[in-house]
Curated annotation (Swiss-Prot):
The chain crosses the membrane at residues 8-28. GO terms for biological process: cytochrome complex assembly. This is Cytochrome c-type biogenesis protein CcmE. One of its GO terms (molecular function) is metal ion binding. It comes from Ehrlichia canis (strain Jake). The gene is ccmE. The lineage of its organism: Bacteria, Pseudomonadati, Pseudomonadota, Alphaproteobacteria, Rickettsiales. Heme chaperone required for the biogenesis of c-type cytochromes. Transiently binds heme delivered by CcmC and transfers the heme to apo-cytochromes in a process facilitated by CcmF and CcmH.
Length: 133
């Protein structure tokens, strides 16, 4: 092979390897992105909620938190629609009525059975002595 052909072959192989690795990385990133749907989107029926776990995000409605023996239920809203969430487990420390949460789980008979609750926090950090009391 001539030197020119070897160089061309090297460049082509390098682009193929680089392109393949970019496709693999982007595919893995796409499968790990954690979007969430609003209660309005879920209740509109435009999302297939029966197949896999989905994430629903919204604000916990004040006064809706109920604790049973080993279950917790509450309603989340996006200020248009609301969904009842049922959860079994320990709630995160930042969870409270009126706070924003993301629940991961499945819709079953009109209510959302969560297997994970993530509490969203305020983006403004304030040390303890500066927080409102």
């Amino acid at each position: 092979m001539k030197r020119k052909h070897k160089r061309l072959l090297f460049i082509i192989v390098t682009f193929i390897i680089f392109g393949s690795s970019v496709v693999i990385v982007l595919n893995k990133l796409r499968s790990n992105i954690s979007f969430f749907f609003t209660p309005t989107e879920v209740l509109s029926g435009s999302i297939n909620v029966s197949s896999n776990d989905i994430r629903i995000g919204g604000m916990v409605i004040s006064g809706s938190l109920k604790r049973y023996d080993n279950l917790i239920s509450f309603f989340i809203t996006d200020l248009e629609s609301q969904i009842k969430v049922v959860y079994q487990g320990i709630l995160p420390p930042l969870f409270s009525e009126g706070s924003w949460v993301v629940a991961k789980g499945k819709m079953v008979n009109g209510e959302f059975n969560a297997n994970e609750i993530l509490a969203k926090h305020d983006e403004n950090y304030k040390p303890g002595k500066y927080r409102a009391k």
